[in-house]
Amino acid sequence: MGTNSEFSPEIDQLKEILISCVLCPRKCKVNRRAGELGFCRLADDVVVSHALPHYGEEPPISGTRGAGTIFLSSCNLKCTFCQNYQISHSISGTVTDVEDLSSIILSLRDAHCHNIELVTPTPHVPHIMEAFLMAQRRGLNLPLVYNCGGYENPEVIHRLKGIVDIYLPDFKYGTEKDALLLSGAKDYPRHAIDSIKEMVRQVGDTLEEYEGIAKRGMVIRHLILPGFIRNSLEVLRLIKTHLSPSVPLSIMSQYTPIPAVKNHPHLGRRITRAEYEHVINYALDMGFENIFSQDENDRALTPDFEKKMPFNWA
């Protein structure tokens, strides 16, 4: 990892992007520093929903003491089925400046978390990276986990080299049709491939662990959607074709219908065991070497952000 002074120009350049915002592929080009709002509805603020030790991530991320997870408000995708819809579809939480966010990061260190995990960081990148570097100057020595939706601008990801230690991107859609239908982002597959390629270039296509705890690398996540199994299979095909079958995959079964889709012909139900096993077996047949899988009990990981503690840890 480089020194803080090395990254100062990168942080300044990220802040400049906010003047005509192209942090994500939607490229709204609004002046967020002047209070203009684009798709994410964020101006020049960081809005924090919750910060807590998270015990429900992949085992090398959560470990025994939890990931130091900061849930950020808003999103550049706003999927119709979003499991975090309470904070992604609206601006919900506390407006937080860089210094206070740095203190939140240090409080998670003091809670003995294994890392600092940023959830939905994309619209907030300039300020949260500045806060993380500030926390490092104040003594932080933990890996940074970038947990994103996969709809990223590769040029922005390039600027995070040496700051982010572990990338945890979603790869939601393998087809433009499904990406447009469910997220209004027809170009999602192309941008997911390009941005994850840049992540791999930075940290490799494996997960480096010490005593079972992730220190560097990446895991690609995919949430299986009921009735969209062909989409899942196409995601796996794209990963193998454009990335590598050695990259760790987290294939998730925890989909829970939210109120907005309760009457949807497919999304209004949970996935079946047969659907999940179909996708897992396809991944194995394609030669993927490192797969994190879930059992049906993990569906309880769906949060309720209206509560002070959004998860019910067993």
Annotate each language-model stretch with its function.
Residues 86-115, 282:
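Conserved alpha-helical substructure of the radical SAM core
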Residues 102-265:
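Conserved AdoMet/S-adenosylmethionine-binding subsite of the radical SAM
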Residues 97, 123-124, 298-299:
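Positions that flank functional sites
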Residues 1-36, 205-314:
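Auxiliary Fe-S-binding modules of radical SAM enzymes
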Residues 1-76, 80, 84-89, 306-312:
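N-terminal [4Fe-4S]-dependent radical SAM core
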Residues 94, 98, 185, 189, ...:
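Flexible, glycine- and charge-enriched loops at secondary-structure boundaries
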Residues 80-84, 90-95, 128-131, 156-157:
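Short, conserved acidic/polar surface loops in the N-terminal third of protein domains
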Residues 30, 88, 122, 173, ...:
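Flexible, active-site-proximal loop/turn residues at the rims of small-molecule/cofactor binding pockets
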